[in-house]
């Protein structure tokens, strides 16, 4: 494939934006390849400005659960645009999406719309601290909860991709109130609560850690979080920005049968437009302004375009949607294991609903330390060869791949064949 136009565009972009991008992973640094500039997408396919076609497993980093340019979403967006893009006042569309979210997410009795997942987690932590009167938050190594200061500590995903353990610019005074323990390690969490329990406002966790390459919870982990937080009077917060409506019809909390106090949402809830949300029990949510004294606001929160895209996306998801994802996931997982075994290359495949992660090591992978043992050099080679075969994968070992309703069995079979061809060139 040729990337002449992308390379020229990147040279210009680097004079205009730091690193030439508006989000670090788009620079493709960890796979040592030129950044690809995209032009358009349709269904399960995405097309770059050089005219190359790819089967897309990035899906805008998760939001496009229906694939690119879903006809129903696009049609209703056109109708919404004709009425106006933003009003700075409430619309009926906010009620529609809020009711749908409340109906689908077990923990949510009231919800507040925002414009990004980072806003959702930031505001949720403020709410947890204000509601409990406590200062400290517990998070898990390798779990990414957006780029607010108190959460950008041992954060996995983008930070891990860049090889940075933490981000400079996070003040010590903020960092000291964030306690970090290994993911899937209840014993470590118990020790943290024994030491700081009276000042822990909440525990925030990705119920499936999608920002270390898709790492599901081990048996009993989420229920253990529920039990420990209840014992100490702390809030359990599920960051379902990635897992929300991807792991199951009732999100990860419905799939695993564990209900948190507060939930953060994003990505799929916006159907490709900038949306975040957080919600939970009425008694907690009613502490937010204007009912309570915990402040939160946003100029474009609940804007009609985002509400339209979100509602028209979620309204098309049914329990049968997730059966389809499981079927495609089974085919892809079996194919990956077969092809990698054929070439004597170790692989560990982790799955949760329409999220799939593969690690180039013997496994198992249940935490960030084990995820870090993946062969990153081989991953970069694999990425480059797969792009040549017309498969667009996340350019980072620490990001998961995503399925959409637009993907077909044919797409999956082509992808498996592409892995076989790529490995044939890499493994001599």
Curated annotation (Swiss-Prot):
PROSITE patterns reported for this sequence: AA_TRANSFER_CLASS_3
Database matches in HAMAP family: HemL_aminotrans_3
NCBIfam families: hemL, PRK00062.1
Reactions catalysed: (S)-4-amino-5-oxopentanoate = 5-aminolevulinate
Name assigned to this protein: Glutamate-1-semialdehyde 2,1-aminomutase 1
Organism: Staphylococcus aureus (strain NCTC 8325 / PS 47)
Pfam families, per the entry: Aminotran_3
Subcellular location: Cytoplasm
Gene Ontology MF annotations: glutamate-1-semialdehyde 2,1-aminomutase activity; pyridoxal phosphate binding; transaminase activity
């Amino acid at each position: 494939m040729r990337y002449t136009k992308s390379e020229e565009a990147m040279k210009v972009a680097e004079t205009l934006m730091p690193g030439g991008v508006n989000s670090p992973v788009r620079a493709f640094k960890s796979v040592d390849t030129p950044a690809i500039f995209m032009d358009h997408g349709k269904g399960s396919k995405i097309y770059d400005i050089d005219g190359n076609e790819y089967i897309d497993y990035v899906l805008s980093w998760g939001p496009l659960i229906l694939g690119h340019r879903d006809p129903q979403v696009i049609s209703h967006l056109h109708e919404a645009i004709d009425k106006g893009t933003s009003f700075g006042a409430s619309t009926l569309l906010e009620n529609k999406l809020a009711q749908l979210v409340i109906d689908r997410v077990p923990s949510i009795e009231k919800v507040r719309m925002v414009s990004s997942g980072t806003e959702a987690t930031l505001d949720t932590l403020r709410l947890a601290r204000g509601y409990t009167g406590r200062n400290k938050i517990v998070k898990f190594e390798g779990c990414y909860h957006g780029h607010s200061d108190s959460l950008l500590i041992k954060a996995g995903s983008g930070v891990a991709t860049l090889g940075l353990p933490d981000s400079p610019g996070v003040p010590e005074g903020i960092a000291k109130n964030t306690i970090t323990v290994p993911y899937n390690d209840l014993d470590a969490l118990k020790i943290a609560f024994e030491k700081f329990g009276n000042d822990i406002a909440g525990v925030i966790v990705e119920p499936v850690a999608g920002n270390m390459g898709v790492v599901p919870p081990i048996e009993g982990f989420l229920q253990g979080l529920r039990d420990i937080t209840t014992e100490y009077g702390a809030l359990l917060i599920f960051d379902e920005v990635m897992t929300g409506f991807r792991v199951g019809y009732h999100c990860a909390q419905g799939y695993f049968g564990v209900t948190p106090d507060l939930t953060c949402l994003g990505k799929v809830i916006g159907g490709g437009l900038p949306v975040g949300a957080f919600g939970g029990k009425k008694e907690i949510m009613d502490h937010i302004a204007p009912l309570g004294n915990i402040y939160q606001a946003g100029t474009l929160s609940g804007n009609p375009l985002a509400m339209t895209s979100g509602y028209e996306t979620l309204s098309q998801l049914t329990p049968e949607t997730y059966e389809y994802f499981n079927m495609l996931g089974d085919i892809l997982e079996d194919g990956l294991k077969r092809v990698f075994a054929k070439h004597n290359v170790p692989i560990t495949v982790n799955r949760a609903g329409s999220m799939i992660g593969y690690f180039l090591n013997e496994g198992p992978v249940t935490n960030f330390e084990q995820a870090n043992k993946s062969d990153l050099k081989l991953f970069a080679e694999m990425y480059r060869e797969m792009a040549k075969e017309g498969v667009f994968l996340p350019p980072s070992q620490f990001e998961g791949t995503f399925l959409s309703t637009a993907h077909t069995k044919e797409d999956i079979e082509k992808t498996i064949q592409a892995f076989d061809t790529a490995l044939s060139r890499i493994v001599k």
